[in-house]
Amino acid sequence: SRTPVSRRSVVRLLEQAPSSALKFFDVNLRGRYYDAGLIREFLNYADVFKINDDEILTVRRLFSLAGSDEEVCRTLLAEYGLRYLIFTAGENYSVIYSPQARSYLPTPKVEVVDTVGAGDAFSGAFVYGILTGKTMEQAHRDAVRVSAFVCTRPGAWPAYTPDLKG
């Protein structure tokens, strides 16, 4: 939300979303367009929160949180009543936390052509998996596979191979 108008619009949409809707918040910190208040406000609406290994440093500072990345993730998960917290560490690994479980997967080694869109592909595949009844672990595996594939193609919207669809 880069302007007060867009922020109010997003909040209005979140308030009107059915309680059954899965509300996803990718913190996606850019420039000067965020502060602790904005992040907290959207976390209060979120069911799923995605943060990467760079963004967690900023959130840790803004929220005055101490501890390891895992401790910060678990604190946010509990404090905001999230169903899932997705933590991505680029070419190294990703972890998805729920109140009851943790799913850790190393990032597959692929010939990287372009990383643009990999995070969004990860998010989309994970949410799709959850919404279609997959377990957190199954949805996580799909998310890792799809995002790795995206990295092997130029551009953010590569044509998916049949084995990646559904």
Outline where the language-model segments fall.
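Conserved post-catalytic alpha-helical subdomain immediately downstream of the catalytic base
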Residues: 80-84, 106-166
